[in-house]
Every structure is written in structure tokens, then in C-alpha cells.
Amino acid sequence: MSKLSHSEVLIMIQGGLVVSCQPVDDGPMDQPAIVAAMAQAAIVGGAVGVRIEGVQNLKATRPMVTAPIIAIVKRDLPESAVRITPFLADIDQLAAAGADIIAVDGTDRERPVAVVAALERIHAQGCLAMADCSTLAEGLYCQQLGFDIIGSTMSGYTGGELPVEPDYQLVKDLKSAGCYVMAEGRYNSPALAKSAMQMGADCVTVGSALTRLEHMVSWFAVAVQSAKE
């Protein structure tokens, strides 16, 4: 359960950058102490909040960060493509570990627990609820259910070819519909993040470009190698 009121959390992240501190799975940076250090560095650098995956990572980060934390659990399930916080037990554990906001998959795909049940459990635990959506219809449905934040997180990640650019249109449409919008997904440069805010996002989350060192190094390595061709 968050120690901050819901209105305080939303005001604190409004107009700012949230940093997703999710290292490459099983990579050398994938350690709770390192995740906590990433979160601290992100706040020092100007982030208004962080997004943390995993209960152990959250437990390591919460004592080090007073800024709002968006928390998730990712699971690979044999019976569902839904990965983000699929079970009610995940919500309970994240709340107990100090999450301010708990995000769940808000797509219309088959899942072990209904979206509305997840929403009710998040609110019962005293946390804000965020829906990671892929389309306008999903976002509007989750808004109508009562989710506090609608994220464009899943746009481009539910099948088909992965787009290169962020989904600015989804951000714009969600905001026009009255949602509190978290722009997320492929915002890999300051210019792209700025554009999200100009499209109406309330805040923007950036991950790989800031906290996945392997990805960043590979971008530079490929560019350097291409100069030899």
C-alpha cells in the first residue's frame, strides 16, 4: 500500500519522466541492488518516478526511493500471452512491498484473472491502478472500469510487425477521451519523449534507452561497425 494519497501520486508524476528500471533478464545488471541503484540514479537525474518489475526488486528499491513507484510482475504463462501482473497474488505482494501504482495488462486477450478483478484488488490494497493497453478501445474500456492511469505500453506488442516509432496517435486519442495518459513504448530518445508530451501525454516512461545497458551498447556497436562497410 502506498504511503502517499492517490492525488499526491498523480500530481507528483504529472508532466514528468518515469524511468523503467528493468535490466535485461538474467543479465549482469539483473540484481535487486543494481535495480535499486538505477532507480536512485534516475531520480537524481530528474525522473519523477520509476517503474520496477518483480517483488524482490521492489523490496530493494522502496527504502531507497521516496518518489512514486509503478510496480509490476512479469510472468511467462503457457495458457496466456498476458505477462504483466497476471495474478491477484502478484498484486497483493507488490502492494505489501510498497508499490504506489500497480500496472496490469489491459489488453483484451485471454487471461487467468479478469481485468476488472485485478482493478478491484489493486484499489482494495490502497494503490493506484494502471492499465497497459494496446488500442484506443482497450484504453477506453479500462478507463470506464475505473483505472487511474491508461498506458500506451502494449501498442505494437500484441502481434504483427513491431513498429519503429512510438504510437503517438494512441496517446493523442486517449488524452482527447479524457484519460490520464502514460506514454510508454519505444520512446528511445529525448526528442521522442518530448513529442509524447506535446501530443498530450500526462507523463512518459522510458526504459531500454536508459536502463538496459546491453541494448544501448549494441546500438552504438552496430553504428560503429556500419562505418566500416
Swiss-Prot record:
Pfam families for the chain: NanE
Domain of life assignment: Bacteria
One function term, GO molecular function aspect: N-acylglucosamine-6-phosphate 2-epimerase activity
A GO biological-process term: N-acetylneuraminate catabolic process
UniProt catalytic activity: an N-acyl-D-glucosamine 6-phosphate = an N-acyl-D-mannosamine 6-phosphate
Known pathway: Amino-sugar metabolism; N-acetylneuraminate degradation; D-fructose 6-phosphate from N-acetylneuraminate: step 3/5
SUPFAM superfamilies per record: Ribulose-phoshate binding barrel (SSF51366)
Keywords: Carbohydrate metabolism, Isomerase
Function: Converts N-acetylmannosamine-6-phosphate (ManNAc-6-P) to N-acetylglucosamine-6-phosphate (GlcNAc-6-P).
Annotated family: Belongs to the NanE family.
Name of the protein: Putative N-acetylmannosamine-6-phosphate 2-epimerase
Species per Swiss-Prot/TrEMBL record: Haemophilus ducreyi (strain 35000HP / ATCC 700724)
